[in-house]
């Protein structure tokens, strides 16, 4: 179930490139331009097949979420719905966009609300999420290549004082 835990972030932009092979914007872009709001639904590996169905080249007006047997539900802070099965949703308001031709745009949005499924929250008060448990993946290039976030590493950021003390600057 998508979260009872909801917390605000310092506004950060989300970007999406939205091409359509038939020389027009995809419905997603058209809807963003019309409503000036959108939900970015992050996808775990268990949702890969459903996510792939939502990328079908359906004609305008077809609800791809329904085709994929996904459930929509009201968003917390925007009018467009979110995907109930998504472990993380960023509810966004349009800041600006760049159009490159008649079917491709980069959309920049301000995150109004971030919603995370309870099972993936380590510390709600501090906004700490169990990222490995999300098992996220994303599109890379072409129409069929994806990457996972299963290989992770942590690095401690150096401080200026530390570098000065070590004679590096």
Task: Describe the residue ranges of each PLM region.
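Basic, polyanion-binding surface patches
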Residues: 1-169
């Amino acid at each position: 179930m998508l979260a009872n835990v909801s917390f605000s972030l310092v506004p950060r932009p989300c970007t999406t490139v939205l091409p359509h092979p038939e020389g027009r914007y995809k419905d997603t872009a058209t809807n963003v331009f019309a409503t000036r709001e959108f939900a970015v639904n992050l996808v775990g590996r268990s949702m890969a097949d459903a996510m792939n169905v939502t990328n079908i080249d359906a004609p305008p007006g077809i609800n791809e979420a329904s085709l994929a047997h996904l459930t929509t539900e009201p968003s917390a802070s925007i009018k467009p719905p979110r995907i109930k099965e998504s472990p993380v949703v960023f509810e966004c308001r349009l800041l600006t966009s760049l159009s490159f031709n008649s079917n491709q745009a980069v959309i920049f949005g301000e995150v109004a609300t971030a919603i995370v499924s309870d099972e993936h929250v380590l510390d709600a008060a501090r906004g700490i999420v169990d990222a490995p448990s999300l098992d996220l993946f994303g599109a890379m290039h072409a129409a069929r290549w994806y990457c996972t976030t299963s290989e992770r590493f942590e690095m401690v950021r150096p401080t200026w004082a530390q570098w000065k003390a070590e004679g590096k600057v």
